[in-house]
Structure formats: structure tokens, C-alpha cells
Curated annotation (Swiss-Prot):
Keywords from the UniProt entry: Allergen, Antioxidant, Manganese, Metal-binding, Mitochondrion, Oxidoreductase, Transit peptide
Entries under Gene3D superfamilies matching the protein: Fe,Mn superoxide dismutase (SOD) domain (1.10.287.990), Iron/manganese superoxide dismutase, C-terminal domain (3.55.40.20)
Keyword Transit peptide listed: yes
Cofactor(s) demanded: Mn(2+)
Organism field: Aspergillus fumigatus (strain ATCC MYA-4609 / CBS 101355 / FGSC A1100 / Af293) (Neosartorya fumigata)
Protein name per the record: Superoxide dismutase [Mn], mitochondrial
InterPro entries attached to this UniProt entry: Fe/Mn_Superoxide_Dismutase, Mn/Fe_SOD, Mn/Fe_SOD_BS, Mn/Fe_SOD_C, Mn/Fe_SOD_N, Mn/Fe_SOD_N_sf, SOD_C_sf
Pfam families xrefs: Sod_Fe_C, Sod_Fe_N
Biological function: Destroys superoxide anion radicals which are normally produced within the cells and which are toxic to biological systems.
Quaternary assembly: Homotetramer.
EC number per UniProt: 1.15.1.1
Amino acid sequence: MSQQYTLPPLPYPYDALQPYISQQIMELHHKKHHQTYVNGLNAALEAQKKAAEANDVPKLVSVQQAIKFNGGGHINHSLFWKNLAPEKSGGGKIDQAPVLKAAIEQRWGSFDKFKDAFNTTLLGIQGSGWGWLVTDGPKGKLDITTTHDQDPVTGAAPVFGVDMWEHAYYLQYLNDKASYAKGIWNVINWAEAENRYIAGDKGGHPFMKL
């Protein structure tokens, strides 16, 4: 049997991010969508193990896409839940990340300019994907980037990400992605983002281990 991954518990109740993300969305997103990625990853890894034992090279090649897609979905969502927090627990409060805030202001000129740039990137995503603030290298360089479908961030440390798949917002916002992108700033966990930024600045990504 291959290593079995499990669905991580949410660090807050399903209704804790309202009114910005509804309880219904959170329950479906976590219990159904994320669980599906976990199940798919476990199944793909088991298929990989059996193919390796059978020396079935074509099968080994074909299963890689399922590992990438479902593994990426598991990584991305595990990071996503932790980079959100209820308002009453500090969600949306950039002052909880003084080091990161200073780096953002140095990179973009102001926090508001950074938010505008990030939202523009989010709304420019075609189809399904993620928007990320990442840090790259020991000098703490910050950049905004996107990943397609469930591809995870590689070559940099994700500081925080925003899920732009329709399942993350459609039941509440319909096709109004702009309102979803605007509202999610109220529940960004800046304390967690600060920890990730500092860890990434030191060249470590301990938060990436699942």
C-alpha cells in the first residue's frame, strides 16, 4: 500500500468566513472538492506502485498526470485553508505581518497598489487556476504569479494563494468574480502569510510538507 494522504481539518468552522465566503461553499469545497483530490492522489499513487512492480512503463507514464493534478489540488487547498482566517481571528489585518507589509510596500509602492495588481492578475485568469503571492530567493523578492488548473507553485515559496476555480465562489457570487476577489481580502490570514514569507526568505518551505 502506498502512503495514504488524508483530508486536513479546517482550522475554523465552516461558517467562520461569512459573509465573504458562505458556509455552503466552504462545506462543498472542503468536504467534496478537496476530498476528491485526496482520493485521486491516493489512487494514482497506488496505481503507480503497482505499475512499478509490474515494470509497466506505459502505465507509469500515463499515471503521472493524475498525480500532478490531484497532488497539486491537495497541496493548493491545504495551503489555501491556512491562508484564510475569520475576521475575529485577525483575518484581513495586514498589520499582523509587519515584515511582509514592508516588503510589499517596497515592491509595489503601497499596499493598495499591491492589492490592485493582485486583483488584476486574479481577474485575468482564463478558465481555472490560482493566483499567488510568492517569494523567491534569500533576499525575499516578492512576485505575483498564477498557476493553471491545480498546478502547484514550483521554484518559489507561496506566501498566500487565492483559488479562482468556479467552485470557490460561484454558488455565492455567480459570475461576479470581481466581488469575490474584493471580499477575500477581509479573510486573508496575514499572520500565516508572514510566517511563510519569513520561512521562504530563509530558503525553507516547511509549510509545504503535507
